[in-house]
Regions:
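Alpha-helical solenoid scaffolds in large eukaryotic transport, assembly, and signaling factors
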Residues: 19-177
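Amphipathic alpha-helical scaffolding segments comprising HEAT/armadillo-like alpha-solenoid repeats
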Residues: 34, 40, 80-87, 131, ...
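Helix-loop junctions that connect tandem helical modules in alpha-solenoid scaffolds
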Residues: 45-54, 88-99, 132-144, 186-198, ...
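Alpha-solenoid helical repeat scaffolds
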Residues: 103, 147, 151, 187, ...
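Hydrophobic residues within the alpha-helices of tandem HEAT/HEAT-like
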Residues: 107-113, 148-159, 203-214, 247-256, ...
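Eukaryotic acidic, Ser/Thr-rich intrinsically disordered low-complexity regions
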Residues: 257-295
């Protein structure tokens, strides 16, 4: 999906969507998100790590962030320079430690659970601060990767942010043509194929969240095969029942939207039948997949 035009941007209070529109867009099943974030602790740690290293304007940005997350003011509380401040924390490795970035990202992951975070995301249309950082996920420390995976996963909590993750509008970054959906795909694949158990688990949650999105199939045209291949490779890593269910749900969805996925399962495997008997819900998904890809 392309990014909305200025006329299509949500209102500042996020209340102008019609009820019928909301009902059509809400996924049939709730997204899987990471809510185990102590935001007061995260902000306290962030303030200590930033002490003496930021400008007066950036101190104001931190105060605005506190208003947004603790005092529950709307995202309107965040000034126009908020993302400039975030970008400096994420990218200035000389001034800020990995721990600073981790607490910043975990703070963003908490903010991602709010429906009006979409206002912040739309402010990033020009500079792509967030998606460019995500594109480099394999270059960040393991802890930064885990925090960013949580942020990505939590953006699926509400309709607007989850749609933002799947925008197909392109831009150039480090000699590559990328888009939100391609970056989201890269994050999902990186996580699911990681040796880190935490990343694997969140990766399976992200894939599940992608699968339950009610979007036009054209959105997945360029990424369905890549995601399916990652899932098949993931099947060889002894996943648990929850992870099997999530990734089978995604595989079934990608089978619906891309005929190439059927060929990939047949040629590369393994066939999901190897998980038969894990649970009733897993068996049901295996039946659905086997109708298109006989074992």
């Amino acid at each position: 999906m392309s990014e909305p035009t200025a006329q299509q941007q949500p209102s500042q209070n996020g209340k102008e969507r019609s009820k019928s529109t909301e009902e059509k867009e809400i996924p049939r099943e709730p997204a899987l998100v990471c809510k185990d974030i102590d935001i007061k602790t995260e902000l306290e740690c962030l303030v200590k790590l930033l002490d003496g290293k930021i400008s007066k304007e950036e101190e104001v940005a931190m105060e605005e962030l506190h208003q947004y997350l603790i005092e529950d003011d709307g995202s309107w509380a965040l000034g126009d320079n908020f993302l400039v401040f975030v970008q400096r924390v994420l990218r200035d490795v000389q001034a800020f430690s990995p721990d600073t970035r981790i607490h910043m990202i975990r703070t963003l992951a908490y903010a991602a659970l709010k429906d009006d975070v979409i206002i912040i995301l739309h402010q990033d249309r020009r500079d792509h601060t967030l998606m460019n950082f995500a594109q480099d996920i394999d270059k960040h420390t393991p802890e930064e990767q885990q925090a960013w995976a949580m942020f990505t996963c939590n953006l699926f909590e509400n309709v607007g942010p989850s749609e933002w993750l799947l925008y197909i509008s392109e831009w150039e970054y480090n000699g590559q043509t990328i888009s939100n959906i391609r970056v989201t795909t890269k994050v999902a694949v990186h996580c699911i194929l990681s040796n880190c158990p935490q990343l694997k688990n969140i990766g399976s949650m992200i894939l599940y969240n992608i699968a339950i999105k009610e979007v036009k199939t054209v959105v997945f045209d360029d990424v369905a095969v890549e995601l399916a291949m990652a899932i098949l490779q993931f099947f060889q890593s002894s996943p648990n029942e929850d992870q099997i269910f999530r990734t089978l749900k995604a595989l079934a969805r990608f089978l619906e939207v891309s005929p190439d996925v059927q060929m990939i399962i047949q040629m590369i495997g393994p066939h999901p039948k190897q998980f038969a008997g894990k649970s009733e819900r897993v068996d049901e998904l295996i039946k659905i997949i086997s109708r298109k890809v006989p074992a």
